[in-house]
Every structure is written in structure tokens, then in C-alpha cells.
């Protein structure tokens, strides 16, 4: 059974993945927000390289990087810039250094659709076609810039080491899908359903891919992003889209 470590796993995406991946994998969650440690949930500051070296098990097979902090401005002040850089870039680099040192096979990086949000408006592509990972990444804010930077850092690790790096540009994953769909029209196109989230990350864990970048979205009507390479290269099979979720209300 593969050992899968979820870094920053205390949020919505981490909770969904932990609850479902434990059926097939030995899953551990590390997060700064863990208050009461258990055998499976540990406290760790991923911006501290030495702490990660100490706490991440050397026999890990896959690291999933879900690190996040709240951000809302396209251009941030110096304090916010430094904090965001620590979480969204430095910690990503540190994790890959740890993976290299421990000879961990794979890092799956939770990137974001904001890597290319210049091309998207309210869940619709502005390109008269679906946005692909071959489109030059034009983000509209610092958050997207740092996500792209971490994707590219993953490329140099995959190029110069044995590490496999898979970037998943996640769409929208609300805690309550049906309630969120009623309140936000954009989600009709950008939602990554819980079932598809698990299917996509499971495919990424199992895929024999050295490096790749993929959009994480369900097969929704008018979705803005192309998922054909995730289907072809990872074996992703989306099952539950927003039309189905709405029809079951």
C-alpha cells in the first residue's frame, strides 16, 4: 500500500481526499492548523525546511501539496507578498528538495485555474475554445503568478532528478456542492465535483508521468478548461458534472 502524504490537508480539498484515499492508500495529513495530533494528522509548518525534513517520513511514496492561505488582491503589499511567497513558492521548492533527498517518487502540486485566469471570465473561456495547458499562462494576480512559478520549479526537478511532478490546476471545490451551485452561476462551469476530485488525484497518484500540467474540472457543459490531456495521459475519468448534480436536487 502506497504511503501518501497530504501537506496542507486541513482544508476542504484535503478533507475530501483524506476521507476517500484512505480506502486504497496509507494517508497522513500534515498541516500547521492541526491542533490535536493523531496517528494520521500531524502539525507541521511547511515553510520551515528543517521541520519538514524531520517530520515527513522517508518511506513516503507520494506527496500532495495543498498549501494555501487566503488572498484577495491582484497586487499585494510587501508583507502579504512575503507571506504568499513563503507559502506558494518557497514551501513548494522545499517540499521538492525533501522529496529529492528522501527519493520520494512523486509530488502532486495543487495549482490553480488562476494560472490562466486572464483568459476566463465568470467561468467562460474568452478564447472561443477551451483553455489548454499549452496556452501561455497569463494570471491576473500575484496568486496565479506564484502558482505558475511553482509549476515551473517542478519542471526543473523533473528534468534534473528522478522526481515525478504533476500539477493540477484545480477549478472550484466548495464544501457543499449543491448549495454552492444555487448561489454561484460560475460554478456550473468551473466545479470539480468531489467524486471527480478523488478520481483525478487517484489517477495522478497511479499515472506513469514524469512531468505534466492538467486542469482539474468536471466534464461540465461550457467548462472553460480542456481536460483531454488529463484523460489521455493520467487516465482521468470524470463521472459527476454539474448537470447531474442539479438534476438530483
Annotate each PLM feature.
Residues 94-138:
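Conserved Rossmann-fold NAD(P)-dependent oxidoreductase catalytic core, especially the SDR/UDP-sugar
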Residues 46-87:
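NAD(P)H-binding glycine-rich loop region in Rossmannoid oxidoreductase-like domains
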Residues 85-92, 96, 108, 146-147, ...:
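Short alpha-helix in the Rossmann-fold core of NAD(P)-dependent oxidoreductases
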Residues 111, 151-176:
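Conserved beta-loop-beta element that borders a ligand/cofactor-binding pocket
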Residues 213-237:
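Conserved C-terminal active-site "lid" loop/helix of NAD(P)H-dependent oxidoreductases
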Amino acid at each position: 500500500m502506497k504511503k501518501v502524504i497530504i501537506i496542507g490537508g486541513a482544508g476542504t480539498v484535503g478533507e475530501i481526499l483524506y476521507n476517500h484515499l484512505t480506502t486504497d492508500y496509507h494517508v497522513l495529513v500534515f498541516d500547521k492548523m492541526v491542533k490535536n495530533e493523531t496517528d494520521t494528522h500531524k502539525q507541521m509548518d511547511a515553510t520551515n525546511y528543517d521541520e519538514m525534513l524531520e517530520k515527513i517520513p522517508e518511506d513516503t511514496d507520494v506527496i500532495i501539496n495543498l498549501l494555501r492561505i487566503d488572498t484577495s488582491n491582484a497586487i499585494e503589499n510587501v508583507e502579504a507578498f512575503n507571506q504568499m511567497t513563503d507559502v506558494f513558492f518557497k514551501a513548494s521548492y522545499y517540499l521538492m528538495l525533501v522529496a529529492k533527498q528522501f527519493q520520494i517518487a512523486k509530488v502532486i502540486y495543487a495549482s490553480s485555474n488562476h494560472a490562466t485566469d486572464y483568459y476566463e471570465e465568470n467561468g467562460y473561456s474568452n478564447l472561443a475554445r477551451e483553455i489548454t495547458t499549452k496556452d501561455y499562462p497569463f494570471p491576473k494576480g500575484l496568486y496565479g503568478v506564484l502558482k505558475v512559478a511553482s509549476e515551473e520549479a517542478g519542471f526543473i526537478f523533473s528534468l534534473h532528478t528522478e522526481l515525478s511532478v504533476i500539477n493540477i490546476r484545480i477549478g472550484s471545490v466548495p464544501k457543499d456542492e449543491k448549495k454552492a451551485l444555487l448561489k454561484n452561476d460560475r460554478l456550473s462551469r468551473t466545479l470539480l465535483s468531489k467524486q471527480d476530485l478523488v478520481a483525478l488525484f487517484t489517477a495522478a497518484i497511479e499515472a506513469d508521468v514524469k512531468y505534466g500540467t492538467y486542469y482539474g474540472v468536471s466534464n461540465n457543459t461550457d467548462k472553460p478548461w480542456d481536460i483531454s490531456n488529463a484523460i489521455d495521459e493520467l487516465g482521468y475519468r470524470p463521472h459527476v458534472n454539474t448537470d447531474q448534480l442539479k438534476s438530483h436536487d
